[in-house]
Structures are given as C-alpha cells and as structure tokens.
Curated annotation (Swiss-Prot):
Record family assignment: Belongs to the IspG family.
EC number: 1.17.7.3
Record-given protein name: 4-hydroxy-3-methylbut-2-en-1-yl diphosphate synthase (flavodoxin)
Keyword annotations from UniProtKB, A to Z: 4Fe-4S, Iron, Iron-sulfur, Isoprene biosynthesis, Metal-binding, Oxidoreductase
GO molecular function annotation: 4 iron, 4 sulfur cluster binding; 4-hydroxy-3-methylbut-2-en-1-yl diphosphate synthase activity (ferredoxin); 4-hydroxy-3-methylbut-2-enyl-diphosphate synthase activity (flavodoxin); iron ion binding
GO annotation terms (biological process): isopentenyl diphosphate biosynthetic process, methylerythritol 4-phosphate pathway; terpenoid biosynthetic process
Top class in the EC scheme: oxidoreductase
Signal sequence range: none
Pathway in which the depicted protein is active: Isoprenoid biosynthesis; isopentenyl diphosphate biosynthesis via DXP pathway; isopentenyl diphosphate from 1-deoxy-D-xylulose 5-phosphate: step 5/6
Gene behind this protein: ispG
Length: 381
C-alpha cells in the first residue's frame, strides 16, 4: 500500500510567518486551533480554569475579552498561570490594548471598525512593538466602517477585504509587520468569498472563522462547511470555530475539522458506521463509550468500529486497529489492517482500550508507526 495518497494532498497558500507568543502562525507552521473564553475576564480564577480545560482539549491559542480596566488588570495573573499564548480582544477602547500589552498579552486583536482614529491605532502599534505583541486585524461584517457601508450599500466580501487592506497598510506604514488578518461574517458565502479574495491579494497570515455561527450542532455544521472549504483550498493559518458552547467544544470541533482533512493529527480518530440491523453489537453506545474512555490519548491513532462484515474488513485495512461485528457474540479484531484475533462481546470495551493503549505505547517507544503517519502528506503537517 502506498504510504502517500496524492488525492489527499492540500497545497497550502504561502504566507509570511509571525508569532503569537511561542506559537508560529503562517509559513510552514501547523494550522493552530484557537478558542475564546466566555467568563468575566476580571474573574481571573474562573478564566484560568476555563483556559486549562481548553488546554486539555488541545487548544494552541486562547483569546480573552478585555472590555474594561478590571479585565486588563486580571490579565497579568491569567497569562502567568496558563500554558498557552493569550490574545487580548479589544473593542472601542484603545487604552485597553495598551494595558493588555503591558500585562503580557501575546497578541492584540483590534477591530478597525471601532478602535478609533489612525492616531489611536498608532499608539496601539507602538505598545505592541514595545512589549513584543503581534496584532490581529479583526474585520467583521457586523461592524464595518461607515464609509465602506456607504460605498458598498451593505456588508459584502469586497468591503471586508478593503477594510482589512486599509488597516494592514496603516500597520505597514508604521513599519509593523507582526500581524495577521481575519475577515469574518456569519454568512458562509460572504466569509469564504472574502477570505479567498484576501488570500489572492496578500501574503499576510490569515485567521479564519465563521463568526456567530450558532449553537453547538448548527454552528459545527456551518463552521465545517466554511472552514472546510477554505482549508481544502489551502487558505488559513490559524482558526477558531465559534460556537454558543463551552470553549473546549470549539477546540474539539476545530481539531476534528483539521483531522478530517489530514492537516493535523491528535488523539484517537474513530471511524464508525451509523449502524443498522446487521450490526453484531451496539455501535452507537460502543463509540460513545470509547470516545470518553480514550480522550486522554494525545498520540495520533486510527480506530475503526464497524458493526458488520459489509464494510468492516475494508475499513480495517486503513486503520491501526479495527473491530468488525461478527456472529455468536464474537467480533473480529484487526491490527495494522490484518485479521489478528476475535474477542467476546462482553469484554469489548476494556479489550479495545487495552489494545489502543498498548499500540500508543509502542508508537511512542518507536517500535511501530501509526497508519495515520503513513497516510499523511508531509506537506500538510
């Protein structure tokens, strides 16, 4: 079997590289996964605890809102107590950006539509330079500048891109180049078109996302369509899935999108059938239980859980460990695509967990290689 499948290749857009704290964004760096806290930032302990849950889910960068002086006052403690770079989200009050930079924020997110005059932007740029922060120019369809709304009549991709490039020029005119850009909209068509246009006319790293995407289910679908299209086209250097849900849920969905496209790998990827009358065991309950039992594993590994022999053996060919439902209460286990042994239904969960943990131990010790790594296009890592 070929170790590289050309139909899985994604040619990523070439962008310049910046840093958000210790995390590289753009260039050949992995596409980073972001989220945003929804606690009161002034409640440092609650915010720290929420960030730590996001860290366990695999977050790379976390954004916190800084609407008032109490929030920026708490930022120093938050930055000190967590293990990921913090982006300070600034709207309306440019002084909050300066305070956040002093407090140790790794990046300042500013919205050109409401941060104020060019002079205020200049002060923010100087603070970012003085304290080693990068900047995110965060353009949003819901808060475009008045002159662009008058020019275009309504928010559209062209207005989003024009706003972004205007403010990129301001930063460049101040000889500041450590910035990334986002052009978000809640409308998938508008957001995707804006990002595609922006990607074609500049080499700045892009933070991609569909803003205000909705609830956990609806927002996951909406973000998967929008971000999936962009990532498949090679557009995007860092991403956030915006959900009306806990931040760690955003992180998990973000990772699942990247894993689905082979752009990054982390933890156990379970491939499972929807189940039908042919199933030899309860696939739905088994998968739900395994997702919970295996969430502590960070090493990339694939596991197929298929209820019958129609597709089970074929799926097992492409996974590290495969399970196919059989008759008489016994099910076939595959290892590295080959039939290995059968197991009784009663011991199924514990047996699979044991097999996965043993495989992970062997991978980490360098004794074997995961099929995920074999199938992966090196250019997409």
């Amino acid at each position: 079997m070929s170790s590289y499948r050309p139909y899985q290749h994604i040619e990523r857009r070439k962008s310049r590289q910046i840093h958000v704290g210790k995390v590289a964004v753009g260039g050949d760096a992995p596409i980073s996964v972001q989220t945003m806290t929804n606690t009161l930032t002034s409640d440092a302990q609650a915010t720290i605890e929420q960030i730590r849950r996001a860290e366990l889910a695999g977050v790379d960068i976390v954004r916190v809102s800084c609407p008032d002086e109490a929030s920026t006052a708490a930022l120093e403690e938050i930055v000190r107590e967590v293990n990921v770079p913090i982006v300070a989200d600034i709207h309306f009050h440019y002084k909050r950006a300066i305070e956040a930079a002093k407090a140790g924020a790794a990046c300042l997110r500013i919205n050109p539509g409401n941060i104020g005059s060019a002079e205020r932007v200049r002060e923010v740029v100087n603070a970012a330079r003085d304290y080693g922060c990068s900047i995110r120019i965060g353009v949003n369809a819901g808060s475009l500048e008045k002159h662009l709304l008058e020019k275009y009549g309504e928010p559209n991709p062209e207005a989003l891109v024009e706003s972004a490039l205007e403010h990129a020029k301001i930063l460049e005119d101040h000889d500041f180049h450590e910035f990334k850009i986002s052009v978000k909209a809640s409308d998938v068509f508008m957001a995707v078109a804006a990002y595609q246009q922006l990607a074609d006319c500049c080499d700045h790293p892009l933070h991609i996302g569909i803003t205000e995407a909705g609830s956990k289910r609806a927002g996951t679908v909406k973000s998967s369509i929008g971000l999936g299209n962009l990532l498949w086209a090679g557009v995007g250097d860092t991403m956030r899935v915006s959900l009306s849900a806990a931040p760690e849920e955003e992180v998990l969905v973000g990772w699942d999108i990247l894993k689905s496209l082979g752009l990054r790998h982390r933890g156990v990827k379970i491939i499972s059938c929807p189940s039908c009358a042919r199933q030899g065991f309860n696939v739905v309950e088994t998968v739900q239980t395994l997702e919970d039992r295996l969430q502590h594993i960070k090493t990339p590994l694939t596991l197929s859980i298929i209820g019958c022999v129609v597709n089970g053996p074929g799926e097992a060919l492409m996974t590290d460990i495969g399970v196919t439902g059989g008759g008489n209460g016994r099910h076939m286990v595959y290892a590295a695509g080959r039939q290995d042994h059968t197991m009784p239904a009663g011991d199924m969960i514990e047996h699979i967990v044991e097999l996965v943990e043993k495989k992970v131990s062997d991978i980490e010790a360098g004794k074997v290689e995961a099929s995920t790594a074999k199938q992966m296009d090196p250019a997409a890592s």
